[in-house]
Curated annotation (Swiss-Prot):
Residues 839-855 have a biased composition (Pro residues). This is Protein translocase subunit SecA. Part of the Sec protein translocase complex. Interacts with the SecYEG preprotein conducting channel. Has a central role in coupling the hydrolysis of ATP to the transfer of proteins into and across the cell membrane, serving both as a receptor for the preprotein-SecB complex and as an ATP-driven molecular motor driving the stepwise translocation of polypeptide chains across the membrane. It comes from the Bacteria. It is an enzyme of class 7 (translocase). The gene is secA. It catalyses: ATP + H2O + cellular proteinSide 1 = ADP + phosphate + cellular proteinSide 2. Residues 829-838 have a biased composition (Low complexity).
Length: 921
């Protein structure tokens, strides 16, 4: 019935696409008009569109004409014409949705349509890719189209300078990787002046391989951190004990990827740690809780993380591997000491643990964009998650030509040995007829095992995994050559097309570079054209050979946890209507089968009389495998949702801090904020030592006097005031407030108001950053133990929200107290006239390194009194300061608000330097 209804009414997806066809027809009708325009007139369309926008037109009203302009520019500069389905893809991207497009359907070209249209607003468009190579390639390749239309293109990749980053983000359209965009956001929120910031907002983003970035990497937070104390000896001492454990000493759950000590295991660790001289007393005493943490991380390092699967060892370092793409994740480190535990296990240099300085998850970073869109070949399996988390709709686009790929049923073997033997036979048979083969594996370990087996059989092949990622693009580009055998870890997000016969652009680039190197000069335009013609002719011959052999044969050597990864592997063949074939070879010893279905599957195969070297193919097997994958996907979805619930708590706090910080950066005068902080500190101090309903005899006068000295640098006769007949705490608070404001006004006069405003701003930003980092560390610690609240029948999430709020409230209180204390302890001394002035506020806690330092270091600033140039950094030009500051115990007269202002203006203090509007929090 359902199929009949779909034929009559069409699917939901069909109904989404139907209205787009009318717009495609109108774009096609504009093609002759655009073809008649000169290059200059075509470029002039951009200025025309922008004027129409300024006059009240909308982007949607310009869409058809703008798309026609982009199509014409692509034809002229790149010899590429957008197909009708690609125009539809551009409309879907512009609407803020995800376009599902098969491999080879030209996603890179589709992005130019929506990117150009949205860049007309002048607020910047970000096109996000999965690696630096693709970002550079696409920026160069598609940048020609934008350049022909008068738009600028920027690229943000690892290693570019701050100036290059600023220029890249200032461009109309910016290409870059998800990591760099996220880290730049965090870096910008650690800068000390607006002109140092790189990004200019989050207007519109197009995410390529959107499922890889927003789903697979959603659980991975971006963290900027600084090193803490070296504990390498402790890591080594604990690591040496783990191999002595027996299986009964821990419980391992491979499905949940968790491992914990049993009671006997804990007792053994306690005994061994004591013998090693590391532990004093019981392991479970509060003072030894860090040893419990180290022991747990060492156990995880040994039992959950495998070399050449989860990480590799390269250049005396442990490099993590992306489980979905098989790539090395350079610069990424596991947190909470787990990375150090793995380094101890592998006996490599143990790098210090890091303290979090700033962090954000991809989920929350990409939700910053006012409009978000994405492209991928495999999003439908995760459509509900895109809708739930990101409010993104997935629209499945038809292919430009019918798919001719043959997807065969899985073949299941009882042993891995039998599976690999059959794979080698299949490769040999396909290779004999020059059919190109792509062998997909789930880990480096498996890819190197397969490579070893192929080498033993003298079958020439190339290996693509995290060890050889530098040659990635070239290896993938040549995988469609007749007779090519390519072994690759997960092909997710590779980004380079596998074209039958070879990739023309890649070959031309490489062969031209080789010829120029041999000749010692650049090839002329004619020589380059001749070389291109020769390569194109050779590719056509090889393409025919590959087609005659049946097209690219994708052979999966095991199923991945995610159906999307398997679908992406299949999608590498059958591009643009080419023939192709895909097939998976599986054994019940594979990780996925062993964890989820091994016993049941083995029993069935035994009952059927299947021998170890025989395979079985049946739709039931496919169904069982799909069920296992769905279970894992559902579990991972729940984990990601749970991560987001917790991260949303800290995200609200992060947004509040970052927004407040940005306000401080934009303001040249934060004296209102500083005065409000002083008021809050005084109120809190009086409330603590002189409670409202307490009798005068119950007041803590000694505590108040000491706090006034330490927090506000004031020595006031509070005891005498308290002894006065009928004096109330409000009156004493008023006298304290008057004394504080008077002293601060005098400091401002002596230092000079412009200089004081700069000092206030620098102190405020530095203390805010320092307290925020400490807060993040506390939040990390809270999150690592909050699950234990469930044992007390309390909801960990609600407990986390409550505790995090209390910590945030404490952060704000400490911020006010620290800023006020630091500023009130500044003392002024007249320096000899002939000497330069010095500004040196009291020592303050330094943020961990490498933390971004402010452009003007308040400590040890040496200013030329005539020019205002900082002699320690001549580029830092400020206004000449007032008298130099130093830490002394001088007594200074107070300036009551109704007294004459010490600056000599003749006005009352409250109407001059004290004219600050009090704001209550």
């Amino acid at each position: 019935m359902l199929s009949i209804a779909r034929k009559i009414f069409g699917t939901v997806n069909d109904r989404k696409l139907k209205p787009l066809q009318a717009r495609v027809n109108r774009i096609n009708a504009l093609e002759p008009i655009m073809e008649a325009l000169s290059d200059q007139s075509l470029k002039g369309k951009t200025a025309e569109f922008r004027k129409r926008l300024a006059d009240g037109a909308t982007l949607d009203s310009l869409l058809e004409e703008a798309f026609a302009v982009v199509r014409e520019a692509a034809k002229r500069v790149n010899n590429m014409r957008h197909f009708d389905v690609q125009l539809m893809g551009g409309m879907i991207l512009h609407s803020g949705a995800i376009a599902e497009m098969r491999t080879g359907e030209g996603k890179t070209l589709v992005a130019t349509l929506a990117a150009y249209l949205n860049a007309l607003e002048g607020k910047g468009v970000h096109v996000i890719t999965v690696n630096d190579y693709l970002a550079r390639r696409d920026a160069d390749w598609m940048g020609r189209i934008y350049g022909a239309l008068g738009m600028s293109t920027g690229v943000i990749v690892h290693g570019v300078s701050d100036e290059q980053r600023k220029a890249g983000y200032a461009a109309d359209i910016t290409y870059g990787t998800n990591n760099e965009f996220g880290f730049d956001y965090l870096r910008d929120n650690m800068k000390y002046s607006l002109d140092q910031m790189a990004q200019r907002g989050h207007h519109y983003a197009i995410v390529d391989e959107v499922d890889s970035i927003l789903i697979d990497e959603a659980r991975t937070p971006l963290i900027i951190s600084g090193p803490t104390d070296d504990r390498s000896e402790l890591y080594m001492a604990v690591d040496a004990l783990i191999p002595r454990l027996e299986d009964s000493d821990f419980e391992l759950d491979e499905k949940q990827r968790s491992v914990v000590f049993t009671e006997t295991g804990s007792e053994k660790m306690e005994e061994w740690l004591t013998e090693a001289g590391v532990l004093e007393g019981s392991l479970w005493e509060p003072s030894n809780i860090s040893l419990v943490h180290h022991s747990n991380q060492a156990l995880r390092a040994h039992k959950l993380y495998a070399r050449d699967k989860d990480y590799i060892v390269k250049d005396d370092s442990v490099m993590l591997i992306d489980e979905f793409s098989g790539r090395m994740m350079e610069g990424r480190r596991l947190s909470e000491g787990l990375h150090q535990a793995i380094e101890a296990k592998e006996r490599v240099d143990i790098k210090p643990e890091n303290q979090t300085l700033a962090s954000i998850t991809f989920q929350n970073y990409f939700r910053l964009y006012k409009k978000l869109a994405g492209m991928t070949g495999t999003a439908l399996t995760e459509a509900s998650e895109f809708a739930d988390i990101y409010k993104l709709e997935v629209v499945d686009l038809p292919t430009n030509r019918p798919v001719r790929r043959l997807d065969e049923d899985d073949v299941v073997y009882r042993t891995a040995k039998a599976k690999y033997n059959e794979i080698i036979k299949e490769v040999r048979a396909a290779n004999a007829k020059a059919q190109p083969i792509l062998l997909g594996t789930a880990s480096i370990e498996k890819s190197e095992l397969l490579s070893h087996l192929l080498t033993a059989q003298r079958i020439p092949h190339k290996v693509l995994n995290a060890r050889h990622h530098e040659q990635e693009a070239f290896i993938v580009a040549e995988a469609g050559v007749p007779g090519a055998v390519t072994v690759a870890t997960n092909m997710a997000g590779r980004g380079t097309d596998i074209q039958l016969g070879g990739n023309f652009d890649m070959r031309l680039e490489n062969e031209r570079a080789a010829k120029e190197k041999a000749l010692g000069r650049e090839l002329s335009e004619g020589e380059t054209s001749l070389l291109g013609a020769q390569i194109r002719a050779d590719i056509e011959v090889k393409k025919k050979q590959a087609l005659d052999a049946g097209g690219l044969y994708v052979l999966g050597t095991e199923r991945h946890e995610s159906r999307r990864i398997d679908n992406q592997l299949r999608g590498r063949t059958g591009r643009q209507g080419d023939p192709g074939k895909s097939k998976f070879y599986i054994s019940i010893e594979d990780d996925l089968m062993r964890i989820f279905a091994a016993d049941r599957m083995d029993a069935v195969m035994r009952r059927l009389g299947i021998k170890e070297d025989e395979g079985i193919t049946h739709p039931w097997m496919n169904k069982a495998m799909e069920t296992s994958q769905k279970k894992i996907e559902e579990r991972n979805f729940e984990i990601r949702k749970n991560v987001l619930k917790y991260d949303d708590v800290i995200n609200d706090q992060r947004k509040a801090i970052f927004e407040q910080r940005m306000e401080f950066l934009r303001s040249d005068d934060v004296s209102d904020v500083i005065e409000e902080m002083r008021e809050s500190v005084i109120e809190a101090l009086v409330a603590r030592t002189m409670p409202e309903k307490a009798y005068a005899e119950q007041w803590d006068i000694t505590g108040l006097e000491e706090s006034l000295k330490t927090d506000l640098a004031l020595d006031l006769p509070v005891r005498e005031w308290a002894a006065e007949e009928g004096v109330a705490n409000e009156e004493i608070a008023g006298r304290i407030r008057e004394a504080v404001e008077g002293q601060y006004a005098e400091l401002t006069r002596l230092i000079g108001e412009p200089q004081m405003r700069r000092i206030e701003k620098q102190f405020l930003l530095q203390v805010l950053d320092m307290r925020w980092r400490e807060h993040l560390q506390q939040i990390d610690q809270l999150r690592s133990v909050i699950h234990l609240r469930s044992y007390g029948q309390r909801d960990p999430l609600n407990e986390f929200k409550r505790e995090a709020f209390n910590l945030f409230d404490t952060l704000l209180g400490e911020l006010r107290a620290t800023v006020t204390r630091s500023l009130m302890h500044i003392r002024v001394q007249q320096a000899p006239q002939q000497q330069p002035q010095q500004v040196a506020p009291p020592p303050r806690p330094q943020p961990p390194q490498p933390a971004p330092q402010p452009p003007q270091q308040i400590r040890e600033t040496k200013l030329d009194p005539d020019t205002g140039v900082n002699e320690m950094n001549p580029a830092d030009k400020t206004q000449p300061p007032g008298p130099a500051l130093h830490q002394a115990e001088d007594d200074w007269t107070n300036t009551p608000r109704n007294s004459a202002c010490p600056c000599g203006s003749g006005k009352k203090y409250k109407h001059c330097h004290g004219a600050i509007e009090t704001q209550k929090a």
